[in-house]
């Protein structure tokens, strides 16, 4: 057979594989849609003009008098194609006030439940989602996070390695056509996705990049008249791409970092004379570590998400071996986040298009063979509403089981798992209603 023929056969096989995968994705989505009325108290969807790689609920909530909803704010970006302008964006999202949802209110065509007080037979239940501010941004927004001490201050990771800092109160609602951040943090030589504000010290920021470095920035050293700021510290403790960084929520001097070099490392910024880590572990994951999350309520517990499809749980006092491994995802785990109020609950997103909830208090529970087919005992729930890779997700601090998730195909979803599933009385879960 000629080499040309081999290429044709290979291309044909790839097309067949793609068609098969598409068919599987569509079948899974159909099943999810059928079961959605019983799985969610609310599920609302909107298609963005451009996909966003980043999403984060802002910490405030506005009650609207005599209305069946409250207004929440969401921080998103854009990932445009070709030369289209990118934006840092603030959206208002109107979330229905809590009420007992009726599965009969499910809008099958839209795949939504939990609208504004009317069943699907009345008004259409469209998500009340409105972009209220668009700020010109250079290149796509890899990641955007607000400063905890002042949510108007937002840091963004750019595709050229720069970190931009914005005071959104100093920008108009509509874009001006000029990229005009309040500060530009200069030091990284390649783009990155690791970005974490210190929850303890206003103006302190940690970033990680594909240039293999972690950099610490002190925004309080900024002087008017010069937008450019250099890092106060540069760490070179990783030997490959740094994927994620996080300040410890309870220890102001500790920062966790993870990398393609398959290590988890802990920096102690009190050690001023070193560019190395204070503690590290390697060989516990089998592939790149993509994400890190410290438990906000248990100071020694942290989690890592890996391209080996697993989530590792660790005790900060002994990083030599994992405490436990969570296994159910069928592809790389890309982001993880602890529940803001439930100490034992962790959420994870994966390239398998799913977001999983894990309840660590269930670890080691006995299962029937039938239960084991649905996953390990810790697997509390899987969100299957996306048919494309998930870019980012965020817990809502004002409504503890509400999440926002964004996928690579422009779809943004806001959803709340049914109380029957995540509430204390798990016997209420209508499993007999679910379709296989």
UniProtKB/Swiss-Prot annotation:
Biological classification of the source: Eukaryota, Fungi, Dikarya, Ascomycota, Pezizomycotina
Record's subcellular location: Cytoplasm; Nucleus
Source organism per UniProt: Aspergillus fumigatus (strain ATCC MYA-4609 / CBS 101355 / FGSC A1100 / Af293) (Neosartorya fumigata)
Highest rank taxon of the organism: Eukaryota
CDD domains the record matches: WD40
Gene: hat2
InterPro entries (alphabetical): G-protein_beta_WD-40_rep (IPR020472), Histone-bd_RBBP4-like_N (IPR022052), WD40/YVTN_repeat-like_dom_sf (IPR015943), WD40_repeat_CS (IPR019775), WD40_repeat_dom_sf (IPR036322), WD40_rpt (IPR001680), WD_repeat_RBAP46/RBAP48/MSI1 (IPR050459)
Keywords: Chromatin regulator, Cytoplasm, Nucleus, Repeat, WD repeat
GO cellular component, one term: Rpd3L complex
Quaternary state and interactors: Component of the HAT-B complex composed of at least hat1 and hat2. The HAT-B complex binds to histone H4 tail.
Family: Belongs to the WD repeat RBAP46/RBAP48/MSI1 family.
UniProt name for this protein: Histone acetyltransferase type B subunit 2
Annotated coiled-coil segments of the chain: none
Annotated spans, Interaction with the histone H4 N-terminus: 370-374
GO terms, biological process: chromatin remodeling; regulation of DNA-templated transcription
GO terms of molecular function: histone binding
């Amino acid at each position: 057979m000629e080499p040309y023929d081999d290429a044709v056969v290979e291309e044909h096989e790839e097309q067949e594989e793609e068609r098969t995968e598409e068919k599987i994705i569509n079948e899974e989505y159909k099943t999810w849609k059928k079961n959605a009325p019983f799985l969610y108290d609310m599920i609302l969807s909107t298609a963005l003009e451009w996909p966003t790689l980043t999403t984060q609920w802002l910490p405030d909530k506005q009650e609207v008098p005599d209305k069946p909803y409250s207004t929440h704010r969401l921080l998103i970006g854009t990932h445009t194609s070709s030369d289209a302008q990118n934006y840092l964006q603030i959206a208002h999202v109107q979330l229905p006030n809590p009420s007992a949802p009726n599965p009969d209110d499910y809008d099958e065509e839209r795949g939504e439940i939990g609208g504004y007080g009317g069943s699907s037979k009345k008004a259409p239940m469209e998500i009340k989602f409105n972009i209220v501010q668009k700020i010109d941004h250079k290149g796509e927004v890899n990641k955007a996070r607000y400063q905890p001490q002042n949510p108007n201050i937002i840091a963004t990771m750019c595709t050229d390695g720069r970190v931009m800092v914005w005071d959104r109160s100093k920008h108009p609602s509509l874009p001006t056509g000029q990229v005009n951040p309040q500060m530009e943090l200069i030091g990284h030589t390649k783009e990155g996705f690791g970005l974490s504000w210190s929850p303890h010290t206003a103006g302190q920021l940690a970033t990680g990049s594909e240039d293999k470095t972690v950099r610490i920035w002190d925004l309080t050293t900024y002087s008017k008249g010069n937008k450019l700021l250099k890092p106060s510290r540069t760490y070179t403790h990783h030997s490959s791409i740094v994927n994620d960084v996080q300040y410890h929520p309870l220890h102001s001097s500790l920062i966790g970092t993870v990398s393609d070099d398959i290590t988890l490392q802990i920096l102690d910024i009190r050690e001023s004379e070193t560019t190395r880590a204070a503690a590290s572990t390697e060989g516990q994951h089998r592939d790149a570590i993509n994400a890190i999350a410290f438990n906000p309520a248990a100071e020694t517990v942290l989690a890592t998400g890996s391209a080996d499809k697993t989530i590792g749980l660790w005790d900060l006092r002994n990083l030599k071996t994992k405490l436990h491994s969570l296994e159910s995802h069928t592809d790389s785990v890309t982001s993880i986040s602890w529940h803001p109020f439930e100490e034992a609950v962790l959420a994870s997103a994966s390239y398998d298009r799913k977001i999983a909830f894990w309840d660590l208090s269930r670890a080691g529970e006995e299962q029937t063979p039938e239960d084991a087919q649905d996953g390990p005992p810790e697997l509390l729930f899987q969100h299957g509403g996306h048919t494309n890779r998930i870019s980012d997700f965020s817990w809502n601090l004002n409504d503890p089981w509400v999440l926002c998730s964004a996928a690579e195909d422009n779809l943004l979803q806001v959803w709340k798992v049914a109380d029957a599933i995540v509430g204390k009385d798990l016997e209420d879960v209508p499993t007999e209603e679910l379709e296989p």
